[in-house]
Amino acid sequence: REAAHSRSRVLHADGDATGREISRALTKQVLSNPRIQIKENYFVAALLTGPEGCYGALAFDETGKNRTVLAKATILATGGCGQIYADTTNPQVATGDGMAIAFRAGVPLSDLEFMQFHPTALHLPTAPRFLITEAVRGEGGILRTKQGLRFMPAYHQLAELAPRDIVTRCILQELQKTGDDHVYLDLSALTPTQIKNRFPNIFETCLTYGLDITKEPIPVAPAAHYMMGGIAIDLNGRTGLPHLFACGEVANSGVHGANRLASNSLLDGLVFGHRIFSYLQAHHLDFSRIPAEFEVTLSGETNPAEVDQDLQFLKKLASAELGIIRQEKGLLAASQMLAPVYSDEQPPFNHKYLELQNMRLIVRAMITATLKRTESRGSHYRSDYPTTDPAWAKRIIHYPNQLKLLPAATLYNWSW
């Protein structure tokens, strides 16, 4: 049983490598299908829009040459935006590109204030912030301070199995008390054989960095993990722009509320990916005509020569003000620091530069939503509004030029 689940309901594949196994199986199917063309090392910079909606995308190949890709249906499945933070379990490509290009094309985003921080990411100086799955605590793993003190029972009746946001804030409180930068996840309740059989991927990864988790506790600390907000979609994966669909972490249907349960992200991607496919089978989308020219919006608001410096600044700012605990003063200051400064120069076709523009846009939108929600709910915690307000049982939908509030139970229905 994983944290906050009422019963054991999560299916696993190859021990602790369920996500990897799903990716492997899907990749195998894609590669074996002669009707699917794969374009590797392309960077999608913008959507192609016009009178009838989305006609496809503008991409750049690895040489920097622009490529126009036309489609009757365009599906964004670009993942999240964890790379806006200094510490994240996300891969390098999780820079919010799908959300950003959709937003520039006028597509509304929703629930952007709800970024989930995973309580237990590997914390070793030489290692990436590798995810230590919740299932480790579900199987008996215990959180302890450097002094060996178990602390979670003092905070919550479910102890280590409390919801992610609670465990994350409790760890943060312990670190603030002690001045340490990590706590320990103690697996001594499990035998070495149980650890190797149940968590082979974690065991091998930690061993790569010189840590034998059958003998030593795992140093862990919270890290940005999952964006529950995203492109507002309906139950068929449709967005506010005709012919554009989205699924997975880039999308927001509302199924995760303010605090996603462990393993439900994989389920989300599978379910909504299939629903989009079913919709496309039943509805033969087409255009009455293809425009000779498309509307394309690229951003060019920072100096290309300062990409690395600006990126580190952005990560530091987001970590400080859009982190586990937020408050108005810091959010307002961050908003002023990120005010766009546009250049008349044509943006360079450099994917690192374009990623930075996307990340800046998403951070600004997140700040706007976080300031708007004057309460704490799920993964969104404000120290200046520390309680949940029933009047805020609402969803914040973010259009390019305005915010709208909708009842929490609202299901989007984009009728094309």
Model-assigned labels for residue ranges:
Residues 1-65, 70, 77, 121-124:
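Conserved redox-cofactor binding core of oxidoreductases
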Residues 1-7, 144-156, 160, 171-174, ...:
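Glycine- and aromatic-enriched mobile tails/lids
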Residues 17, 66, 85-93, 127-131, ...:
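Alpha-helix capping and helix-loop boundary segments enriched in small/acidic/polar residues
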Residues 33-37, 41, 109, 182, ...:
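Flexible, glycine/charged-enriched surface loops at secondary-structure junctions
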Residues 46-68, 211-253:
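FAD-site-proximal beta/loop scaffold in flavoenzymes
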Residues 71-73, 77-82, 250:
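Glycine-/small-residue-rich beta->alpha transition segments that form the dinucleotide
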Residues 90-103, 109:
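Thiamine diphosphate
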Residues 101, 107-218, 269, 279-285:
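An anion/pyrophosphate-binding glycine-rich loop and adjacent beta-alpha core
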